[in-house]
Amino acid sequence: MHAKSLTELRAALAAKECSAVELAQLYLKRIEAARDLNAFVHVDADLTLAQAKAADAELARGAGGALTGLPIAHKDVFVTRGWHSTAGSKMLANYESPFDATVVARLQAAGMVTLGKTNMDEFAMGSSNENSAFGAVKNPWDTNAVPGGSSGGSSAAVAARLAPAATGTDTGGSIRQPASFAGVTGIKPTYGRVSRYGMIAFASSLDQGGPMAQSASDCALLLNAMAGFDERDSTSLEREDEDFTRHLGQPWAAGNDAGKPLAGLRIGLPNEYFGDGLADDVRATIDAALKQYEALGATLVPVSLPKTELSIPVYYVIAPAEASSNLSRFDGVRFGHRAAQYGDLLDMYKKSRAEGFGPEVKRRILVGAYVLSHGYYDAYYLQAQKIRRIIANDFQEAFKSCDVIMGPASPTVAWDLGSKGDDPVQMYLADIYTLSVSLAGLPGMSVPCGFGAGANAKRPVGLQIIGNYFNEARMLQVADAFQRATDWHKQVPAGV
């Protein structure tokens, strides 16, 4: 039962093959048995089972919806009433929110059962989930490897089938890269599509929540509940509600032959995504996935995103600048860590922040404060914003000749735990293919498409699919067609 997708579990509940309480108990036992993965940081069986009982009561009355009774885990960046909400930081180690994030509230209103809070890089700053105050997360496929970050706890939980689905956030690739490393499906919606209210902020102009699950169809179900305008979030976009499942299983164009369901689909391949730095085994796996798309009727079209290499310096100016402002609120006064020994108030601020924040967070706060300081704002921050606009324009130019863009989600498979901790630049380079999508505010997703080679044969590879603004339903259709023709998304780590 634990290996079933959300769609399959939904059918099992409808057929009364199991109850919501039985499902919750099953996953809680699995979470306890897999504590060595360190995927979860907060679990409360009483809260979970109370939600499951309420879901069973709804189902018994025939009042349940598409997600009623289905379990989900939440990245610990979403504040959740009744649970600790820490953002992976010592600074918020004992914080309990008096309210639910909009994402959490909407999924609970849809009847979903919260299994717990998943581990993450501190304040979502990291690409490996080694920056957490609660310790590193292990990749279920190879426990010597990282699960990706910053949503590494969520990706590991779904991969190990400790939860059928999880929420994540993506600022520069933090849903797509861990989804790739852990062999699960994850989607970052268009910026503003999903409310950021109650999501502990890293970089406000980039942060976006999204679902992680086994399949594109599962992600579509979740996005139906998560997306929508929220007046409490000033960056939330007013759009008519839509059904993200509406194109699943449908041909790209009416009248397509059943054997060529994607005939007419134009897939853009950026030259810059297939150059130096892309590992040979990842390239071979992506090439095989693209051949599968050709077999389904799609046409491959060369495109160019010439400013791709600038996305790293641009991101690491803009994101730290916004982080330095957002994290200024954590000073040990109202909540969070407070130093035990200090002199005056200013000394308390300094010591509380020095003790409460980890090394990577401190690094980014310092960088952000520097680029925003007098004399450097124009040279760095303003210039980065101008290049950000050029990057977005490059995508729009590319979309004139294609419907979606594809390439690797990461230049390599997951690396060994501890292997890049002393070299932050090498860690940052791992996000080269995801950063520009975030800077442009576009939707993007990662779909499992195979594994590495040799010593990396147990480490998954993800295919990144990028769509134009508000084109999530079509992206999910394209991903779903691939998953109907392959079984990479159904494969599980040994022992699972």
UniProtKB/Swiss-Prot annotation:
The active site is at K75, S150, S174. It is an enzyme of class 6 (ligase). PROSITE patterns: AMIDASES (PS00571). The keyword Isomerase does not apply. Its EC number is 6.3.5.7. GO terms for molecular function: ATP binding; glutaminyl-tRNA synthase (glutamine-hydrolyzing) activity. Allows the formation of correctly charged Gln-tRNA(Gln) through the transamidation of misacylated Glu-tRNA(Gln) in organisms which lack glutaminyl-tRNA synthetase. The reaction takes place in the presence of glutamine and ATP through an activated gamma-phospho-Glu-tRNA(Gln). Heterotrimer of A, B and C subunits. It catalyses: L-glutamyl-tRNA(Gln) + L-glutamine + ATP + H2O = L-glutaminyl-tRNA(Gln) + L-glutamate + ADP + phosphate + H(+). GO terms for biological process: translation. This is Glutamyl-tRNA(Gln) amidotransferase subunit A. Pfam families: Amidase (PF01425). It comes from the Bacteria. Keywords: ATP-binding, Ligase, Nucleotide-binding, Protein biosynthesis. Belongs to the amidase family. GatA subfamily. GO terms for cellular component: glutamyl-tRNA(Gln) amidotransferase complex. It comes from Burkholderia lata (strain ATCC 17760 / DSM 23089 / LMG 22485 / NCIMB 9086 / R18194 / 383). The keyword Metal-binding does not apply. The gene is gatA. InterPro entries: Amidase, Amidase_CS, Amidase_dom, AS_sf, GatA.
